[in-house]
C-alpha cells in the first residue's frame, strides 16, 4: 500500500468579537472568546485516538493558544510556522464587510471581480497566500510519510489547502465552509494522489 501522510487540518476557535457582523481580522492578533477556548478543549477529546506525530500552527494567538492545548493532550510540542497565518488584508484589517463596502466601494468591487489576484493596499492576494502556504504543506507531507500530523490554521488558509487537495481553482475559495474549530482530514499519498476524507467536521 502506498504510504500516506494524513493531515488533520483545524481552523482556530471562535475569536473575541465574533458575531453576526463579518469582519476581516487577517494578521491582526485577535484573542479567543471564552467559547473559542472551550471549543479547543472539546476538540482535543475528538482527536485523542489519533496517533498524532507532529503539530504545526500559525503564529497568531487564536491558533497558537489552541495548539498548546491540543499538543499537551496529544503529547506533541507545537511547531510555530508563521507562513500558516491568515491572509493579510492591509488597510482592511479589523473592518466589517459593511464598513468596507461603504469606505472602499471601488476596492470591494475590484476584489469581487478578481478574488484570486486582487491585493488590498498593504495586503496579500489569494494567490500570494497560496504561494507561501503550499510549500510549507508540501514540506510537512514529505517529512511525515506514513504518519498523521495536526495543522492549526485559519479559514482562508484552510480553504486554499483544501482547494489544492481536490484540484479546484482558487476562485472557488468561498465554496468551502470553515466554521470555528472545525476539522478537515486530508490523505496525501506518495504517488501524488490526494483524498479529502472530511471537510468542516
Language model: regions and residue ranges:
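Surface-exposed helix-capping loop/turn segments at secondary-structure junctions
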Residues: 49-53, 141-149
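Phosphate-handling substructures
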Residues: 72-132, 187, 195
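Short basic (Lys/Arg) and small-residue
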Residues: 154
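Short active-site segment of divalent metal-dependent hydrolases/proteases
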Residues: 15, 157-158
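Active-site signature of alpha/beta-hydrolase-fold catalytic machinery across serine-
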Residues: 69, 160-164
Amino acid at each position: 500500500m502506498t504510504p500516506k501522510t494524513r493531515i488533520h487540518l483545524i481552523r482556530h476557535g471562535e475569536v473575541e468579537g465574533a458575531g453576526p457582523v463579518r469582519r476581516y481580522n487577517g494578521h491582526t492578533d485577535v484573542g479567543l472568546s471564552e467559547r473559542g477556548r472551550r471549543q479547543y478543549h472539546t476538540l482535543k477529546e475528538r482527536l485523542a485516538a489519533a496517533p498524532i506525530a507532529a503539530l504545526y500552527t500559525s503564529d497568531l494567538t487564536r491558533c497558537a493558544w489552541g495548539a498548546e492545548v491540543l499538543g499537551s493532550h496529544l503529547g506533541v510540542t507545537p511547531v510555530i510556522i508563521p507562513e500558516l497565518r491568515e491572509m493579510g488584508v492591509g488597510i482592511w484589517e479589523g473592518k466589517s464587510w459593511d464598513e468596507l463596502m461603504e469606505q472602499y466601494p471601488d476596492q470591494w468591487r475590484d476584489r469581487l471581480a478578481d478574488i484570486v489576484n486582487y491585493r488590498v493596499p498593504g495586503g496579500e492576494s489569494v494567490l500570494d497566500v497560496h504561494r507561501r502556504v503550499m510549500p510549507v504543506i508540501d514540506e510537512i507531507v514529505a517529512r511525515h510519510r506514513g504518519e498523521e500530523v495536526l495543522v492549526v490554521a485559519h479559514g482562508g488558509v484552510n480553504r486554499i489547502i483544501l482547494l489544492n487537495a481536490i484540484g479546484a481553482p482558487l476562485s472557488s475559495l468561498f465554496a468551502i465552509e470553515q466554521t470555528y474549530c472545525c476539522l478537515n482530514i486530508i490523505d496525501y499519498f506518495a504517488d501524488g494522489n490526494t483524498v479529502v476524507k472530511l471537510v468542516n467536521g
